[in-house]
Amino acid sequence: MNFVFTDEQLQFKETIKSFLAQECTPESIRLGWKENSPFNQKRWDDLISLGVIGSNLSEEDGGLGVDQVALTLMIEEMGYSGLPEPVAEQNFLINDLLDIFPKDIKGALIDKFDCGSKYIAV
């Protein structure tokens, strides 16, 4: 067994870490609380632009096809920063959710999830 992270996994993690250091500061989170708006739409849109939302979907389905290790590294960095947006829910549940739908509905849902107009929450 090989327990060493690949260069690609580490690069993905560092990209997320760098983004969060700039965009998910304690001040920005506190501002959301103060405004009673913990969900930051601009930050969500930026996460979509980075390909984070649905990143574990296959490339055929519009994702990056990242594996569970890279996904976990990404979510771990988001936890460190206190990111309030539902990225973990969106990414961990999307494949299982999409598997229960027929192809025609699945395609329409993928488009909505990838562009951020629909959210998965628990």
Q: Residue ranges of each PLM-predicted region?
A:
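Intrinsic disorder at enzyme termini
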Residues: 1-8
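Catalytic cores of phosphodiester-bond-cleaving enzymes
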Residues: 1, 21, 35
